[in-house]
Amino acid sequence: MMNITDYENIWQSSLIHVTDEFTLPPVVLQAGEAIIGTLGNFSVSTGKAKAKKTFNVSAIVAAALINGKVLEYQASFPESKRTILYFDTEQSPYHCQLVMQRILRLAKLPIDKEPQNLKFSHLRAIADPNERREIIRYAIYHTPNVGLVVIDGIRDLMLDINNSTEATKLVGDLMQWTSEQNIHIQTVLHLNKGDDNARGHIGTELNNKAETMLQIAKDGTQPERSIVAPAIIRSKPFDKFAFRLTETADDICIPELDLSYTDCARKSHHFSYQELSDSEHRKALEQTFASGELLPYGELITALKAAYAEVVGQPYGQTKLKELLRFLLNKRMVIKEDRGKYSFNSDYHY
């Protein structure tokens, strides 16, 4: 039980001073120039059932294992942060081993030799979600040189995904573990069947607190292909990319970058501005207001047309552009200033 002195110490240590010097947390995961993960933060991979979320996470882990590039993921962990902890809460030991072999194949490492920097734990057999959580906590705090932690199946660390108290406590744990141990945690969570929202209160909390949220989805025209997109990202967004599954000579199924996936194929599925992600809107609006100046109505419509055409792959007509502007104004993404000019509200919440 903490006393007044404890609270005073915590209060004083929490204060930020204008003369303090801070640097950007070390960037450890990127896709192109986009920052996906830094030490001291956590990210989320989301997608509906069978979208191949675990295959995508396998590529992230493989990149971290070699501190190099796999698919579009580039890892750059400090030498003192090269150990990876992978916790799977859903699969049997047999299927967990297949995931481990897939990671090693992606990293071009032998599958008959224990990897030096990867520890893989299966927690399905543990019935109590709180025990699973405490095991993860113990491993994080008692394993040397940890840099990346993967929790594949974070909903299994709580009894009820719609319990707001449980969700807040679990996300609080993620924030505490990443901050105190200076690590990056990548979690995996299903999307709702009926929409593209992360499931339950835990999905809402992760959505609000995560550094990055990746969305993995089956391609609507080619179901054997999965598309990776930045649903939420603090840095500038990366271009969506796609992968297909291929078998190696020893029958291990791995994801392989689909180089035939093009901008036009990608953007045609998101013609409606209401279907665009936060990062896609932000990209278009940053281009629209690239000059940094207030825009009169006519110039704004012209700039919106060009910017959104680049995002969705084809231009909107005048009626659609007027509807788009009304949408942006209602969302406070664009603000109408004095004298009929418009500005970009970069601090909007989508």
List PLM regions with ranges.
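Phosphate-binding/switch region of NTP-binding enzymes
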Residues: 44-46, 50, 165-253
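Alpha-helical scaffold elements adjacent to nucleotide-binding pockets in ATP/GTP-utilizing enzyme cores
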Residues: 59-60, 95-103, 135, 170-173, ...
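Structured loop/turn residues at beta-strand edges in well-structured enzyme cores
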Residues: 40, 82, 144-145, 181, ...
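Conserved inter-motif catalytic segment of the P-loop NTP-binding fold
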Residues: 78-162
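The Walker A/P-loop phosphate-binding site
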Residues: 2-103, 346-348
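C-terminal regions of RecA-like/P-loop NTPase motor modules
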Residues: 142, 220-350
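Flexible, glycine- and charge-enriched loops at secondary-structure boundaries
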Residues: 93, 129, 160-167, 200-203, ...
